[in-house]
């Protein structure tokens, strides 16, 4: 089946946007691509466009639907990896496919954001579905206006992060994950394997040069959890040393689970998001 969606960005909900922006500028070794607001929805954001997707830091900044979602997440989970957003080049075709696959989606809704530095405006159309369709995980689909290209987050330091390798979703139902990500969103299931030491199944859905790693276990919560993120570095030694020198709490570099990879864990400056840095030398 032709893929209906790619991965557009991940959302990290934060309490203090200025602090979070400083932390992620340091972590990524990049300057923000965009620092804006959504006046109609009561939120403000900072965006970092990487090679494959972008990272959005999102905070409540007024009254509105999005502000309510952010506030509820902060009350229930604290700062966290709060949302996974998919992209389509044809929003009408996506709506038709989703509805035919049993995903009850909204009609496309126009949206816009304003950059506080340049005054530029970006425009898009969003398609929403009830969070129960994703077993509690906040997600939606977006088609960006062709004239609203997001600039790349400029590299400011050596050992900068260049992309997202994967995000981790915890679930109690592998079959529900295959239906949602595979059948309804049209994302390719690249690998499914049983992992006895975890007591469950591991699924890898591939899009946008990254994976959604779904860990399905009977011990998982009833609702799915968007849990952690792995960031790509071309030179993990350089990235690791840069972070250590800046006072970021970072583990030693070690061999990754995938042959040929080396990883380290970042333990601070992540807004509570479990974060791994990975270099693939295979």
Report the location of each language-model feature.
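N-terminal beta-strand motif that seeds the catalytic metal site of vicinal oxygen chelate
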Residues: 1-17, 79-86, 140-176, 226-229
């Amino acid at each position: 089946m032709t893929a209906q969606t790619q991965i557009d960005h991940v959302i990290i909900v934060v309490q203090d946007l200025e602090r979070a922006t400083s932390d992620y500028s340091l972590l990524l070794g990049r300057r923000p691509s965009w620092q804006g607001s959504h006046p109609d929805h009561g939120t403000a954001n900072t965006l970092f466009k990487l090679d494959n997707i972008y990272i959005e830091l999102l905070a409540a900044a007024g009254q509105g639907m999005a502000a309510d979602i952010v506030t509820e997440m902060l009350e229930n989970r604290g700062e966290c990896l709060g949302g996974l957003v998919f992209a389509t080049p044809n929003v009408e075709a996506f709506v038709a496919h989703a509805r035919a696959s049993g995903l009850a989606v909204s009609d496309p809704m126009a949206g816009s954001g304003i950059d506080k530095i340049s005054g530029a405006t970006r425009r898009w159309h969003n398609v929403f579905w009830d969070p129960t369709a994703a077993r509690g995980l906040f997600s939606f689909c977006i088609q960006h206006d062709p004239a609203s290209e997001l600039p790349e987050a400029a590299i400011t330091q050596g050992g900068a992060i260049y992309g997202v390798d994967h995000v981790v979703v915890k679930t109690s139902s592998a079959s529900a994950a295959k239906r949602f990500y595979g059948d309804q969103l049209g994302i390719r299931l690249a690998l499914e394997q049983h992992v006895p030491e975890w007591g469950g199944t591991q699924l890898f859905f591939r899009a946008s040069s990254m994976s959604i790693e779904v860990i399905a276990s009977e011990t998982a919560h009833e609702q799915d959890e968007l849990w952690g993120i792995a960031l790509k570095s071309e030179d993990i030694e350089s990235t690791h040393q840069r972070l250590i020198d800046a006072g970021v709490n970072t583990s030693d570099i070690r061999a990754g689970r995938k042959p040929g990879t080396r990883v380290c864990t970042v333990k601070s400056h992540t807004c509570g998001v479990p974060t791994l840095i990975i270099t693939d030398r295979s």
